Structures are given as C-alpha cells and as structure tokens.
C-alpha cells in the first residue's frame, strides 16, 4: 500500500493513504481478559506498537484510523441510524453454530465431509440468540451484474472469479450485524438498541469512510446528511476523498470487501471504491508461518541487520500481487547481494568514484548513448506503476541497472582515462553513467525512499520529492558537482544462514 501511494504521488496524482486498526470484537475482549487489562488499554498498547513498526517500515500514511476512535464511532452510529430509518435493518432470533475465532456464524457448508468443523474455525459453539440483521440478500443480483460489468473492480482476475463463483452458487443471506451486549461488551453499542453491540466487520469496514467524513468530504457527508455533522465543515477541496481509488486487502478478507462492503455502500447511497486489490499471504520456506513451530520472519531483526530498504525491496520484488509469496533467508540474501550490493550499489559507487577521480566530480557535457535504454526503462516503469504491477516496475528499474553496468564493461572508462586523446569519449561515458544513476535514484522513490535520497545526495542534489518529470534524460546539467560516494548496500560476503 505504501509503495502504491508513493507511486501515485510520484506520478503527480492527488493521493491520500489511509490505514489503521480494527480493534473491537470477541477475540480482542478475550485477549485483554487473559492479559488482565481493560480492552481499551490492551488496544492502546497494540496500536502504539503497530505505529512504531510502521515508522520502522518507512510508511507515510496520511492518517491512521482506529475503530476505538470517537470520530469513527460517530460515523458508525450515523450509518446505523440511517440504515435503521430506511428499513434496511430488522431484529430476529437465530439458532446456529458460531466460530469464536472468526466471530461469525457457520452453516453446514463450512463443515468437513465427516461433519466436523475445520480447524480454521477454532472453537465452535451452538448459540440461540436474538440479533439485528442487515437486508443484504436483496442486492445479490445487482452485485453480480456490477462485478461482471466492471472487470477491474476486483483484482486479480482469479479473485474476481472467486467472488462471482460464490455469488452465483450460493444464496446471499442477510447479514447479522450485532452481538448481544450481555455476551460481548467490547463493541460499539447500537444507537437505537443499546442491548446490542455492532458486529466487528460491519464496524471495521465503515472505517474507510471515517476519515473522509471527519475531514468534510462532500460525497460522504451528503449521504449521511441529518445523521452526521463533521467538525471541520464541508467543502474543503482537500477533503474530497471518496470514492477511494483502491482498497488493498489480504485474500482472506475478500468476501467482506467485495460482497458486504459494496452492498453496505449501496444502502448508504455512496459510490463504491474503484478497485479492490487482494494480495496473497507470506509463507516461510514453502510453509505457512507459525509461531508455534518457529517458522516466522522477524521484520525488525531483518531491518536491524540489513536495512529497511533491503526489506522493502525483497517484499515487493518477491510477492506478486495475488498469489502467496515465499520468504527464504537464502533468497533474501541472494537478492541483496546480486541486485542491491553488486547491481545497484556497485553501479552508483563506481560511477561516482570515476567521476571524482577523472573529472574532480564535475559533470561533463551531455551525452546520449544510454538515453534510449533509460527512456524505455522509465516508460515501462510508469506503465507498471499505473497498473499496480509493482514487481514489473522493479524489473524496469533493474533493466537500466544492468544496462549501465554492462556499459561500463563495454566502454572500459578506466582504460580510456589513460589516453588523453580519448578524453571526449571518457566524458561521454561518465555523463551516461552519472545521469543513469540520477534517473535510477528518481525511479526508486516509491520503493526505496531512503536509498533514493541517499543516492541523490551523493549526486549533489538535496531532493526529497522526486516525480516522474525528474526522470527525463538530460536533466543532469553539465558543470554540476557531485557529492561524496558512500556505500549504499555493504556487501556481506558470508551471509548468515
């Protein structure tokens, strides 16, 4: 999500990156009880830990919404009141089996062939209770038509087909949106029936419109008119945030986002997000990560040893959006050595060192030998970024890294430097290399932001907000003086196993 947001800013698009935490529900209440603390204190500590972790990852989200925030509760109450007044909610009794782990009612379709419950559901109990329901079933055909008419709405395509398969093969039942407060106290009480609290997913999904509503987004606030009043007022152009361009989610929660959420928005009178992009899970050495078996990756430990940009690089380079990714320590170390240290880092270091050694760090006149390669790399990079094909964007960058390193081997500037008659040739080689390094630094902005700034600083530029317009060949002026070359990705000749 951070790379996509940075990428959109890089392309010059107005961008607002929202993330946060859903904190209500039975699992949280039980975890807090086991910990001997209030649910709020428990959530406060986890939220602080998460935000600290986000900072270590170099994330630049514009806002962070917690479902325990009062601003969020106000929006949830407004939505519930509106749907209640419209007749979209009703109360009825229900007897069924309930997964405590997943906080959802189950049906016989969720059983194993032998009639038992799959381990994914955890503890399953039989409940007989009254709850409030949202009239979701009446929207089934509308949602099928919408997804079929808009192929890009759910991506990748096979996730879209999964959603359509579900909608076409099963009758969409009305959604239970409450839990009795006598059983679950940790939730947002229904404003019109305080004996119930809001179902965690109905509450959590609403967080997408919490910040737009609070900032005065006219679309959201017009839909909730009479039910919600933003403190900041309506009409500030900076508040025009809805509909969202993209929701980036995990594959395990696609049903909530591609089925429940669109229907909720339709009932509210709100437009839908333009795209729901579902990514896979990380495996470790080909197996599901598990704390109990020790088969996990500690991101902080990786960042401490290898640097945040090395971690960001491998995560994006190795995980295509859609299928599961497979983390291996050997794979991480191999990519670090070959692509970061020996590829990118070596190119930057030797290009600048040669310019310092042979021309006192002064950029010679423009030369264009590598311009076609750089122009193609930029075009491929931009196309991939627009399509959210982040792996392909990195491939485009490293195509220029490889070509520039090849150019050094072909032109042999260290040999040219020995012959005064070849000074013009050496000048051309040096310009091509240093300008390629500058363009690479610009393109790295969304992916390796810290390294991008470091490279630009070594090139003698104090630049932190690079955009696609900076990636034009020839923007490096003759006579410019570069800074001091420093190792970007120190080689680790004996990586730890």
Question: Where are the regions that the model predicts?
Answer:
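Active-site-proximal binding-pocket segments
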Residues: 254, 318, 322, 331, ...
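N-terminal alpha-helical segment
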Residues: 24, 295, 373-378, 436
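Structural signal for well-ordered, non-membrane alpha-helices
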Residues: 51-54, 80, 84, 345, ...
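Basic, alpha-helical terminal appendages of large translation-related enzymes
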Residues: 16, 37, 92-97, 111, ...
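Structured secondary-structure scaffolds
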Residues: 1-19, 71-78, 119-357, 393-397
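Hydrophobic packing residues in well-ordered alpha-helices of helical domains and bundles
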Residues: 43, 76, 337, 367, ...
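A glycine-rich phosphate-binding loop feature that marks nucleotide/adenosyl-phosphate handling sites
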Residues: 24, 96-102, 280-282, 331-332, ...
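N-terminal, positively charged nucleic-acid-binding surface of large information/translation enzymes
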Residues: 1-155
């Amino acid at each position: 999500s951070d790379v996509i947001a940075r990428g959109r800013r890089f392309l010059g698009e107005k961008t607002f990156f929202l993330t946060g935490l859903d904190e209500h529900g039975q699992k949280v209440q039980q975890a807090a009880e086991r910990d001997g603390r209030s649910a709020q204190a428990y959530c406060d500590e986890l939220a602080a830990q998460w935000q600290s972790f986000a900072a270590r990852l170099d994330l630049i989200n514009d806002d962070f919404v917690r479902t325990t925030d009062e601003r969020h509760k106000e929006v949830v109450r407004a939505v519930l009141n509106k749907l209640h007044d419209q007749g979209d909610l009703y109360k009825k009794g229900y007897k069924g089996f309930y997964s405590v782990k997943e906080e959802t009612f189950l049906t016989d379709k969720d059983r194993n062939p032998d009639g038992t419950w799959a381990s994914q559901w955890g503890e399953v109990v039989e409940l007989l209770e009254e709850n409030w329901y949202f009239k979701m079933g009446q929207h089934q055909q509308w949602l099928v038509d919408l997804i079929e008419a808009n192929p890009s709405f759910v991506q990748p395509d096979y996730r879209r087909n999964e959603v359509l398969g579900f909608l076409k093969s099963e009758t969409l039942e009305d959604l239970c949106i409450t839990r009795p407060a006598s059983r679950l106290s940790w939730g947002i009480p229904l404003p019109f029936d305080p004996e119930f609290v809001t179902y965690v997913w109905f509450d959590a999904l609403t967080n997408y419109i919490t910040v737009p509503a609070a900032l005065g987004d006219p679309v959201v606030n017009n839909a909730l008119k009479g039910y919600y009043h933003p403190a900041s007022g309506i009409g500030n152009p900076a508040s025009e945030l809805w509909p969202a361009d993209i929701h980036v989610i995990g594959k395990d929660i696609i049903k909530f986002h591609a089925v429940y959420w669109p229907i909720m928005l339709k009932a509210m009178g709100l437009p839908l997000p333009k795209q729901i992009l579902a990514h896979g899970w990380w495996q470790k050495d080909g197996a599901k990560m598990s704390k109990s078996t020790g088969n996990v990756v500690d991101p902080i430990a990786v960042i401490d040893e290898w640097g945040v940009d090395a971690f960001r690089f491998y995560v994006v380079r190795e995980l295509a959006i859609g299928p599961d990714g497979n983390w291996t320590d050997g794979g991480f170390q191999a990519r670090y050595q070959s692509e970061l240290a020996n590829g990118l880092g070596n190119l930057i270091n030797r290009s600048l060192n040669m310019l310092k050694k042979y021309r006192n760090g002064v950029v010679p006149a423009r030369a264009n030998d590598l311009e076609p390669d750089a122009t193609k790399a930029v075009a491929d990079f931009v196309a991939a970024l627009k399509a959210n094909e982040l792996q392909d964007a990195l491939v485009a960058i490293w195509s220029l890294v490889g070509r520039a390193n090849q150019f050094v081997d072909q032109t042999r500037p260290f040999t040219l430097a020995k012959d005064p008659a070849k000074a013009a040739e050496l000048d051309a080689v040096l310009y091509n290399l240093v300008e390629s390094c500058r363009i690479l630094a610009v393109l790295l902005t969304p992916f390796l932001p810290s390294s991008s700034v470091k490279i630009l600083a070594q090139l003698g530029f104090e630049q932190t907000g690079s955009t696609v317009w900076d990636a034009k060949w020839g923007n490096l002026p003759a006579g410019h003086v570069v800074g001091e070359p420093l190792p970007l990705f120190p080689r680790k000749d004996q990586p730890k196993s």
